[in-house]
């Protein structure tokens, strides 16, 4: 989250990452419809939603089945988690994103920050081998990192617009990959 906030008379500051897991009834799983109605009212406030970077559509992730289980040699999950933990502290990926992403003038700062953080996360997961901006295939970065990050943030904006008219018909800024 990494933000300063005020809630119900409490001032706070956060630099932690948070993941909310939950089930939304199948009939409500429509990003273009209001999905948050069955959640606690705290999660139906635009101020909190604005601090959530993106929404992962769980219904697009295949259900676990026997065909997805591995046999034989595999990557140890504890080792993999250790790698991810180390990558979390590696700021070089964010520096790469800063160098290759172009932000339009007057773009909303919170949207821009959310998209950049999500794109950085995708970069770490999908292209952990990159060490500088010259190692990045710009088209792959756009297709696999930046575009999905913007889609994840767009769902948040759509949900905000269904709660408060201030956010209605507002889209995320169109971040682009710099050509050079």
Tell me what each language-model feature is.
Residues 7-180:
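C-terminal regulatory/interaction module of P-loop NTP-utilizing enzymes
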Residues 1-5:
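Short, small-residue-biased leader/transition segments that mark boundaries at the very start
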């Amino acid at each position: 989250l990494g933000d300063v906030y005020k809630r119900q008379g409490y001032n706070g500051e956060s630099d932690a990452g948070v993941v909310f897991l939950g089930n939304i009834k199948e009939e409500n799983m429509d990003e273009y419809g209001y999905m948050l109605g069955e959640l606690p009212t705290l999660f139906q406030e635009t101020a909190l939603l604005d601090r959530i970077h993106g929404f992962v559509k769980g219904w697009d992730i295949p259900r676990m089945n026997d065909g997805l289980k591995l046999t034989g040699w595999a990557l140890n999950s504890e080792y993999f988690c250790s790698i991810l933990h180390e990558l979390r502290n590696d700021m070089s990926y964010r520096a790469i994103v800063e160098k290759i992403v172009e932000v339009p003038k007057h773009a909303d700062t919170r949207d821009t920050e959310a998209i950049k953080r999500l794109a950085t996360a995708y970069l770490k997961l999908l292209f952990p081998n990159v060490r500088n901006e010259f190692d990045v295939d710009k088209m792959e970065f756009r297709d696999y990192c930046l575009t999905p990050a913007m889609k994840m943030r767009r769902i948040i904006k759509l949900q905000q617009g269904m709660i408060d008219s201030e956010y209605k018909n507002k889209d995320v800024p169109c971040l682009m990959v710099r050509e050079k």
